[in-house]
Each structure stands twice: as C-alpha cells, then as structure tokens.
Amino acid sequence: LKEVVPNSIPAHLIEFNLGSSWIAPELYEEYVKDKTDVDVKFTAAGGTWFMKEPHWTDNEKNRSFGVHSDLLGKHIMGHELIEAAIQNKTITVSTTRKHYDGTSETITDKEATQACSSRIDEIRQEFKDWARNKMQSNPEMSDKIEQVYNDLFNNYVPIDIPSEYIPEHFGGATHNITLRPHQAKAVVRGTMQPLMLAHEVGTGKTFTLISTAMEMRRLGTARKPMIVVQNATVGQFVASAKELYPNAKILTLEDSDRNAEGRKNFYAKIRYNDWDMIVVPQSTFEFIPDSEERQMTFIQDKIEEKLTVLAKMKDADKSGRNLITRQAEKEVEQLKEELAELTTTLSEKRTAKDEKKRAVTKQNTEVKAREMLERRTDETENFDDMVIDALLIDEAHEYKHLGFATAMQRGVKGVDPSYSKKSQGVFLKTQAVLQKSHGRNVIFATGTPISNTAAEIWTFMRYLMPSETMKEYGIYYFDDFVRNFGNIQQMLEFTTSGKFKENNRFAGYIDLPELVRIWSSVSDTVRTKDAGGVSDKIPEMEGGKAQDLYLPQTTALRGIMKYVKAELEAYDKMSGKEKKENSHIPLTMYSIAKAAAVDARLVDETAEDDPNSKTNEAVRQTLRSLKETAS
C-alpha cells in the first residue's frame, strides 16, 4: 500500500477560497476581526456558512472597509461584505419608500451596488493573500491545513487494471471483433462500480456499453440489463450488439411499435421474459413511470433540501444584526431549522413570522417537487416492478439538468440550477438500480460530460457517487462544491444590447488535480488521441485550433441590434414587479441577437442576402477548404 499512496501535497501548492468548507471557521473569524475589528462566529451547516455578529458593529475600521451610498444615505459595513463574499452572494443597495397614497417605490443605487460587487470580488482575492501570509508566519497552522487537505482530497488513486487481467475477448463475444484496450478496461471497471464513460466521439462507446451489459449478465451481477439510446440510433445499436454477440437474446422496440399499444406490449415482454439485453429508445424510456414510494422519497428529499436553503437565509432587523441562532446538523439531509426565540417581543413576532414562512415554503416546495415529477407516462408497471437491475444510458448529457438548491443569487453567471422533468425520472431510476445492485450497475456514456455550466460535473457525481462519499468530500451541496473547487471572479462581459457589463462568473476551478482525482473515481475518460489509432482517421485541424474570423457588421444586423438594445434598456428601467411580468424579454432579446449574428434572415425573412453574413463566409471558407484538399 505504501507504494501507491499519493505523495503529500505541500501547503504552498494548496489553494482555498473564502468559504471553503474544509477550512476551520476560526480562520475566517480571524480575518473578519483583522479587517473590521468585529468579533463574529461562523457556523457551517447545509452547504453554507452562517455568521453570528455582536450587537454593536459600528466602528471606524468596519465602516472604512465597507461601501457608502450617497444616494440613499446607507452604509454597507465591511463585515457584511465579507459575509456576502463567503456565501457567494451579491448585495443590492436599495430602499423602499412609501408614498402618501399608499403606494411604495423601490429605489436602487446602481453605483453603490456595483461598488459592493467590486469590493466583494476584491475581498475574495485579498483573503487568499492574507491567508497565505498567515500560513507563512504560522507553521503550525500551515501544517494543519496541509494535513486536513491531504487527508480529505488526496486519498484516492485512479484504478489501473493490468493488461494481463483484460481478456482478448469477453465470454460470448465473437472473435471476429477485438475491443481496443481502453474499451476492454472500461468494461471491467463498469462491472465493478457506477461509471461515467467520458469517451470522445469515435472511441467506440457503443461496443463498450454492449460488452459491459453482457458481462454483467455473464457474471451474474445483473439479470436484466437495460440500455437507453437515442431514438434515431436504436436500429444501428441493435445491429452492433448482434454483430458483437451473435447469440445474444436482445429485446428492442421497432419503429412501428412506438405507440401506446406497442409500448404496453413491450413493457410486458420486459417484465415477464428473460433477456440478455433490453435496448430502449430515449422517448420510450421516459414514458416508464416510477413507483409511488420512490416518488414520495424524492419529494421528501426536495422538501428537506429546500428547507435547508431557507435555513441559510439571513434574517436581520433594521440595524442589520442577526436575530436567529442557527445550528448545524449532524447529517446535512436532516438539517432542521432551529429558530431560537429571543426574549424581546419583536423577536417573538419575528419567530412566529419565520415559522409561518417555513410552513409556506414547505408547502410550496412540495408542490414544486410534485411538478418536477409530473411528466407524461404510460399506464403500466412502474420501473421497480420491471425488475431492471442494470441501467446503461448512452448520450447521458441529455439528462444533465437535475436541478439543485442554492443560496447563490442569480448574480453569478455560469451557474444554472434549472431542472428538466426527464432528468428527474432518470435520477429515480438510477437510484432504484443502485439500491437493487448494492451500489453498482449504473453506466452513463457521453462524449461531452461538461459543456456549458459548472454544475454538470457535480450533477453527474450526484448520479453516480454515494451521497455519503460526497459528504465526506464536502461537496454534497452545490454551494460547498463551488466554494471548495470553484473560482468566482468579476469579469467584464459583452451584453446582448452591445454594452460591456461587469458580472460575477464561475470562471473555472482551483485545486484541479484533486478535483480530477475525485471525478476519476466515478469516470473513465478517453480522448480520441489516446484511443489507439482512432485519431489517425481524423484530419488535423488547420493551425491546430479553431480560427477566429472577424467580419464587418451588416446593415441589417445593425438595425436589429439597435432594436434589441432599445428593448433591453426599457426593461432595465422597469420596476421589480414589471420585470417579473416581463421576464421573457431578456431571453427573447438574447435569442434574437444570437440568431441575427449568424444571419439577419433568421430574424427578418425580408432581409437581403448580405455577402458579409456569417452564413456566406462559412460557405466561402468551406469551398476554399474543399478546393485546397481536393485530390
């Protein structure tokens, strides 16, 4: 064992954020004291840090570390900015004024709000320098951080299966086809644990999935493996399965049977017959209902998750002092909001209000959770009753919108907590299989596991990694994952309306080697260039990377962008209520601008066919390439 234990990562190579869950709260408390001269206490619970502050926080040092709003005559104290930074929140400087006629108006100081955003970003960077200096001057603290980090994140060695344990041909497979080494190794891994086959296009995921299902069946770890594939590739996939395993008993759904009656007969065949492999189109798979018991468990988990996020929210009086004492739970899922009653009448009123808010939230969350599960399904046996004990899903990126609760506000770009109902259904089915198979027999496959948002890698870990393991790593909640491995920065970005705007964005990762190590515990990553001869068939990209071409803005595009800009400026001037009623405007304008940038005719069919459009430039470049490479 000593030979394979990873080398300890020295403290000077370890990065951590303001808010990393594995850091002792005393370090954050010392930082607040040093910068603001305010004594606070931090408590970690349910994926965030709660700050308990003293009654009196108004001192010169705290004020100078904060931000002042001349427009509203308000001051955001330094410790409040640090709290926002540690919770990855933004601060909006505003006030609500009531008029004599009973109406009210919310006034926002945009300059002070932007100043708070910039200051919070500065605090995140300043903390890293401050902590680094502390570690240099305090060797004992440095050693402790090094030990905690290595014990927590540097404790896994990626599996390496020796070639002598990999058969040339798996039992029952034709000897006319030999899997590549990376395929055979992935099959062996897939029979041992839940796994993401993060194999690039062209590396042979189809044969890997087929072989894994058949090996599960041969070894007796699964009696009824199901493979989910895209509708258009069902026939091709089944043909590949018969080619690799000529004697396999395979059930699939023909195109002519993809109707309600055909699906009903198909489900009966699944339940009452013995199959080596069941190949299901995605659309049919999504029609299979889940058991009521599993749905109820899902709903209860969602309620608990939502209440956990509610428990994170700061409840402050007019002076900005916290009135609620929060307690961390022993297990994150069992977090219960403990609202301590304070001795004053005001606190009693607030406590009653909070309990009412909690009850309403619980009710709303249950309704929301039920909506997440409400999708069109067939009236047939549920997935549990079909006795499927192995589930292999091709093109798994179709199910990456699992959704999650977060205390981060919408001010952080690159974070998408939205969900899709089909993803919820897949999650329930994977949980059913994991339960039946004692924590294995779930295989995902995709060439693009991470394509758009920071949440995707975390989402796939939720599918495949035991919740207890995620808790041990301190990444069970998305907010903890971001604080431990994310890098949030303020960046100047080009907006849909053609202006530059500073946004807080999930800009990348820190401690990437350790994150990759955790990810590799549930994934098998293969790039085309590493796939043994596959890359030889793919022509090299000109210049080694995509080329940027700059074109002048067309007259039609200029007119469309002027319209988009005017609409968005009008939207920015709306009140909060009006923005809520017209929430479709930003997305609509973004879609229009994106389409017009390709070709104005996608927005206005009467627009001219401009020779300077991206469409025409793409045609010219394609013709040039064809002529240059013509033999």
Spans of features found by a protein language model:
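Charged, low-complexity intrinsically disordered regions
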Residues: 1-153, 246, 270-278, 294-344, ...
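Conserved pre-motif I regulatory segment
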Residues: 157-198
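Short hydrophobic/aromatic beta-strand immediately N-terminal to the Walker A/P-loop
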Residues: 195-200, 226, 443-444
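P-loop (Walker A) phosphate-binding loop of NTP-binding proteins
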Residues: 200-201, 230, 448
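Conserved SF1/SF2 helicase motif Ia
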Residues: 208-239, 248, 436-440
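Conserved helix-turn-beta segment of the N-terminal RecA-like "Helicase ATP-binding" lobe
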Residues: 232-258, 269, 464-468
